[in-house]
Regions:
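Catalytic binding pocket for nucleotide-activated donors in carbohydrate/polymer assembly enzymes
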Residues: 1-121, 125-130, 135, 139-151
Length: 151
């Protein structure tokens, strides 16, 4: 990790990182596990979000138009809104977007405060030993792979 400050959702490896580093040393955003389940139960509809949120509408319209790089992004636009044979916005990106924008705002604000940014970075360096590759491999060898390893 080398002092990197994480911007991310509270899933996957970020759950363990959050447990070790705490809220104050990460920029978390997005729906929590129980909120994802509830949103799905209530009939998640990304097109409704697109229709009601001007910022998301503008972003997706720009994606649909492209970025003058010669690459066409209509498929991404269509998959997010309509699924194109799959689940629309399977990872609930549109639901997370406002929260992501807020996390980005907090990150930019924190970066402007060099002392605070450096304190957070140093904290993450000091607490990241548990995530070292050697420790992780030893843990996997013992708990998951059940193979001997040399200490």
């Amino acid at each position: 990790m080398n002092g990197a400050l994480t911007v991310g959702t509270l899933d996957g490896a970020n759950v363990e990182m959050h447990r070790v580093l705490g809220d104050e040393n990460m920029f978390l955003f997005g729906l929590k596990t129980e909120e994802v389940a509830e949103t799905r139960r209530n009939g998640y509809n990304p097109y409704r979000i697109y229709s009601r949120d001007p910022a998301i509408h503008a972003v997706l319209d720009q994606i649909n138009k492209g970025f003058s790089d010669g690459v066409r992004y209509e498929d991404l636009h269509e998959r997010l809104l309509f699924g194109n044979g799959g689940t629309p916005d399977e990872y609930m990106l549109l639901a997370d977007f406002p929260s992501y924008c807020e996390a980005e705002r907090r990150m930019v604000e924190t970066y402007a405060d060099r002392t605070k940014w450096n304190q957070m970075s140093l904290h993450n360096i000091a607490r990241s030993g548990i995530f070292a590759a050697d420790r992780s491999i030893a843990d996997y060898a013992e708990r998951i792979w059940k193979v001997p390893y040399k200490k």
